[in-house]
Structures are given as C-alpha cells and as structure tokens.
C-alpha cells in the first residue's frame, strides 16, 4: 500500500463523510505551496545560471550562497505600495493580475506526478490543460486595456498576437500526441510511452514520444517559450522600447503576480513537455525503475527549465515580424505536414504505436 493510500484510508476512518473534501483541499494546498517554493528557487536558479554563463557569481549576499534571496525579494515586493494610475479602470486593473495566476495554478489539477498521484485524473485532461492555458491571453489584454496607457496597450496587443499565433502550433503538437496515444488522459499518455520495442529491451527513453515526434517536440517547446513571452520572444516587454509592456503601470504585489504567473507557466510548459514527449515519471532505463517516478519527472522538468534559461542568456531578441513569420510560415506548415506524415505512418504496416 502506498503512502497516499495509507493517509486516505486513515483519514476516511477518522473524518468519515467529510474526508474526501478535506483530502482534496489538503492536496491542493500542498501542490500550491510546492509550486510557490519552486517558483521562488527557479528565479534564484535563473539568476545563478545566467551569472555563471556571464562568468560571474550571481546573487550571493542574502543567506548562505544567496539561498535566502527569493525570500528577500518577496518581502520587498510585499512591502511596496500598489499604485493605481488615476485614469485606470479600478476593478479591471486589479482583477487582471489575479486572472493571470489562477489559470497557471489550475493546470496542475491534471498533471500526473507519478502513477496514481494526480489531483484530478480526468479523461479530458489534455483538452482541459490546453483550454485553461489559453485563458491567460485575456488577462494580458485586460491588463493593457485597464491601465489606460498607450504603451501598456501596445504591449498587450503584441502579447495577444504572439500568444494566439503560437497556441495554434502547440495545439497541433498536442493533436499528434493524442493521435499516437489514443487518449486525452495524461496518465494514459504516459502509459502509452512505456511500451514498444525499446521499452521491451530496457531502453525506455527510446520509446518516448520525443523520438518519433522530434520536430513536433522541438516546435512545442519553442512555442512554449513564445507562449510565456520569454526571451528571445519577449518583444511584449522589450526593455529598450516599452519597458514592461502590459505590466508597465503595475507595482508591488500586483506586478509580482504577473511574474509569478510567468514562472508558473514556464514550469507548466516543461511539465507538459515532460509528460507528453519525455515519458513523464518513467525512468530512462528499466534498471532504474526502483527510483520513485516523481524524481524522474522533476529531473526532466528541471532540465527543460534550464533550457528556458539558457535561451535567455544566449539568443538576441527577435523582432516582432520575425516572431510572426516563424509562427505562421515555419511552425504551422511543419506541424500540419507532420500530422499528415503520422496519419499515414499509423495506417501503414510500420505503425510503432499499436
């Protein structure tokens, strides 16, 4: 019996009918707290890694080796005043930051951490994740419009066009995973990657979707970088032009909520990429299967997040027209072509997804 089953049965005996509600709230709270801690130390890891890439130390003053820097940053932002521009629409201005964070947290309801460990094991998990992720664009537009500033509105328009453009390519990538797995349930998608010739010989990582769907995996991940408005696709908040884009009139914790949503979305994109293309909690080799699955999932997410950071430290910012051209003239045609290729592949005698 697993630890979760032991807690579940013990709680059911103790609280009776109220236990399912209490257990659901406890799991949600634990996941939310862990995500917040991950975001705090992801920001520290980003600053450290970029520092090392620039041949410097990065934050090292607050606490041992700078480990308390995220706590200092949070306290600083908590103590800053939220200044609302006179011309801003009061309620919409305050709703926009919250509206960015809620969908970012909500996606975690369907992401499986290991076999049987998921908040909501629903059959339409992939569709749910895609639909909830799409809500973020409305919050960005709302923030730009409610500020009643032409610079914020320009940033919001850029963000909306960019996010919608790359969502189409990401959608096609998810359609291909659906075609090969035959299910929208994320746990079943992970399970579908645990079979095949290579998995039968103990080399599990060659059975994962990244290999047969390599171009789509690359497109999905790069589109994820664009979707989160991260460098080199950060024309939304180009420092040399409109500074913080749609966030330019925000301060204090309202400003921090936008950054919180951005970093949670980075982790979400990495978690979905690991689940859909990298076998989720599956170990790369059969002889390593004794290690808990959540370790492998976290390791894959960490590796993908490090690629996010590496891209920020390495590539120059794209121009707006280059971003649009890449999305519409490169990624979209490749995705459509790959849908046709995989369709014929699955109907041929060489179908590897049987």
UniProtKB/Swiss-Prot annotation:
It is an enzyme of class 7 (translocase). Keywords: Cell inner membrane, Cell membrane, Membrane, NAD, Quinone, Translocase, Transmembrane, Transmembrane helix, Ubiquinone. GO terms for molecular function: NADH dehydrogenase activity; oxidoreductase activity, acting on NAD(P)H, quinone or similar compound as acceptor; quinone binding. One of its GO terms (biological process) is aerobic respiration. It catalyses: a quinone + NADH + 5 H(+)(in) = a quinol + NAD(+) + 4 H(+)(out). The chain crosses the membrane at residues 25-45, 91-111, 126-146, 170-190, 205-225, 253-273, 290-310, 330-350. It is a multi-pass membrane protein. GO terms for cellular component: plasma membrane. It is found in: Cell inner membrane. Its main location: membrane. InterPro entries: NADH_UbQ_OxRdtase_su1/FPO, NADH_UbQ_OxRdtase_su1_CS. NDH-1 shuttles electrons from NADH, via FMN and iron-sulfur (Fe-S) centers, to quinones in the respiratory chain. The immediate electron acceptor for the enzyme in this species is believed to be ubiquinone. Couples the redox reaction to proton translocation (for every two electrons transferred, four hydrogen ions are translocated across the cytoplasmic membrane), and thus conserves the redox energy in a proton gradient. This subunit may bind ubiquinone. NCBIfam families: PRK06076.1-2, PRK06076.1-3. NDH-1 is composed of 14 different subunits. Subunits NuoA, H, J, K, L, M, N constitute the membrane sector of the complex. HAMAP family: NDH1_NuoH. Belongs to the complex I subunit 1 family. This is NADH-quinone oxidoreductase subunit H. The gene is nuoH.
């Amino acid at each position: 019996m697993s630890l979760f089953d032991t807690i579940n049965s013990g709680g059911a005996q103790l609280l009776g009918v109220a236990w399912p509600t209490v257990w659901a709230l406890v799991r949600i709270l634990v996941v939310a707290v862990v995500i917040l801690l991950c975001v705090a130390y992801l920001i520290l890891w980003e600053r450290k890694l970029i520092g090392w890439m620039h041949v410097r130390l990065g934050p090292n003053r607050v606490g041992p080796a700078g480990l308390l820097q995220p706590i200092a940053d949070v306290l600083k932002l908590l103590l800053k005043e939220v200044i609302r521009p006179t011309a801003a629409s009061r309620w919409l201005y305050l709703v926009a930051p919250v509206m960015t964070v809620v969908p970012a947290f909500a996606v975690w309801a369907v992401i499986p951490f290991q076999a049987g460990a998921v908040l909501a094991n629903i059959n339409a998990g992939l569709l749910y994740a895609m639909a909830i992720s799409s809500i973020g664009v409305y919050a960005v537009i709302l923030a730009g419009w409610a500020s009643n500033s032409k610079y914020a509105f320009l940033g919001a328009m850029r963000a909306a066009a960019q996010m919608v453009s790359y969502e189409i390519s990401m959608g096609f990538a998810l359609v291909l995973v659906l075609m090969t797995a035959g299910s929208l349930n994320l746990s079943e998608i992970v399970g579908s990657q645990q079979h095949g010739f290579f998995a039968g010989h103990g080399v599990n990582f060659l059975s994962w979707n990244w290999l047969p769907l390599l171009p789509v995996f690359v497109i999905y991940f790069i589109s994820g970088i664009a979707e989160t408005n991260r460098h080199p696709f950060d024309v939304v908040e180009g420092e040399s032009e409109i500074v913080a884009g749609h966030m330019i009139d925000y301060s204090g914790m309202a400003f921090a909520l936008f950054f919180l949503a951005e970093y949670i979305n980075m982790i979400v994109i990495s978690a979905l990429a690991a689940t859909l293309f990298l076998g989720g909690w599956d170990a790369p080799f059969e002889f390593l299967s004794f290690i808990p699955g959540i370790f492998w999932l976290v390791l894959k997410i960490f590796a993908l997040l490090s690629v996010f950071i590496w891209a920020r430290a390495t590539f120059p910012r794209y121009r707006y027209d280059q971003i649009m051209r890449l999305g519409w003239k490169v990624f979209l045609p490749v995705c459509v072509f790959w849908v046709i290729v995989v369709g014929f592949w699955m109907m041929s005698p060489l179908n590897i997804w049987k």
